[in-house]
UniProtKB/Swiss-Prot annotation:
Monomer. It comes from Cupriavidus pinatubonensis (strain JMP 134 / LMG 1197). One of its GO terms (molecular function) is ATP binding. This is tRNA dimethylallyltransferase. The gene is miaA. Catalyzes the transfer of a dimethylallyl group onto the adenine at position 37 in tRNAs that read codons beginning with uridine, leading to the formation of N6-(dimethylallyl)adenosine (i(6)A). HAMAP family: IPP_trans. The record marks T108, R130 as: Interaction with substrate tRNA. It comes from the Bacteria. The lineage of its organism: Bacteria, Pseudomonadati, Pseudomonadota, Betaproteobacteria, Burkholderiales. InterPro entries: Dimethylallyltransferase, IPT, P-loop_NTPase.
Amino acid sequence: MSALPSSEHPPVVCLLGPTASGKTAAALALAQQAPVEIISLDSALVYREMDIGTAKPTREELASVPHHLIDIIDPTDSYSAAQFVTDAERLIAEIRSRGHQPLIVGGTMLYYKALTQGLNDLPQADPAVRAKLDELAAERGWPALHAMLAEVDPVTAARLAPNDAQRIQRALEIHRLSGQPMSELLARQADGRTFTGAADQRYRVIALEPSDRAVLHARIAARYDAMLAGGFIEEVERLRRRGDLHPGLPSIRCVGYRQVWEYLDGDTDYATMRERGIVATRQLCKRQITWLRSTPERLSVDCVAPDYVQQVARLAGM
């Protein structure tokens, strides 16, 4: 049987939420109610050999329902929002052709925005420019490059942490390639873009948001401790032994991995590494919640409520 035209399909359910908000549990519960296939919306889960620190679903969970865009690239490679859009659109069509329902699950809000609102026209990544910026960062540190960014693009610099290496590098790269601040380029593109509301009709967005952020913070600390007890440091040691990975790669910049890498370099002690890993995860959580709350089409569920899974199921309508 051929797939129905897109307009005849129900909206694609997108289950979005910050780290430790219970997305996996809710998604697996939905899979018990309907023939779904999960499309991961997570920039860290794409990497092979990075299981513990990314809180990747267990083998049993992965086997219980089809998952996509997990374990698809090597840690030496990178994966972009553009690649996600291409892969997600292909997967949505393939899943529907099998008579199943696609369920997008994750917390990489940039990927969701690219899928539903389109990609921007910023310059493509330039390996030579990035290599030069990596050299500068190695010499001076990322806070120094953050200061450089503040001189040429204060708007972008103001919303980035001084150690947000990946985003600082991208903003400086765009400025070097275009001669213009990234914030101005994005503002001009937003001014010239009109949205028809089609995204609202094609996607049903369920957002897991905490009524009490302290509960989520406690979960984050407990989960990070569980990762450390479960072999996270040994996982990073195995990655280091490969010999082809370094802290400048997007994979090793993932929250948690960067902090453990620094610990294994001897730059910090265990207690400092643990604290920095928890703080970095909480900062990621804060950014994710900010993104979610700027998404007007979302249907909000309190992820610390005892019946949040049941609420998600009702809103999903599967």
